């Protein structure tokens, strides 16, 4: 995962009052943090906007990831963390050309 994406996501979670472990190269850590803090993040995502800086692809991906997280929360996290990670990784690979 691109370091700037990990940094933006970590800052967003931190702004929501959530400390998360980012020791994996996929998005498992993110979806575990979201699931473990679903009520807190629901409120945060409904009341804030998050401006990203950087290149267009990074901004596009981070905002798309935020939309995916919001939808997942709206569906009470019924899909597994693994399914959500696979979705995020698939889109990440397509956008950034990573195998």
Which positions does each model-derived feature cover?
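Alpha-helical bundle regulatory/interaction domains
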Residues: 1-99
């Amino acid at each position: 995962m691109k370091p700037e994406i990990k940094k933006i996501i970590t800052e967003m979670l931190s702004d929501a009052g959530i400390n998360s472990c980012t020791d994996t190269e996929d998005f498992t850590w993110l979806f575990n943090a979201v699931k473990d803090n679903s009520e807190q993040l629901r409120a945060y995502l409904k009341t804030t906007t998050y401006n990203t800086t950087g290149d267009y692809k990074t901004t596009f991906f981070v905002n798309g990831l935020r939309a995916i997280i919001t939808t997942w929360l709206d569906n009470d996290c019924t899909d597994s963390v693994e399914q959500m990670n696979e979705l995020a990784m698939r889109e990440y690979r397509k956008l950034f050309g990573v195998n």
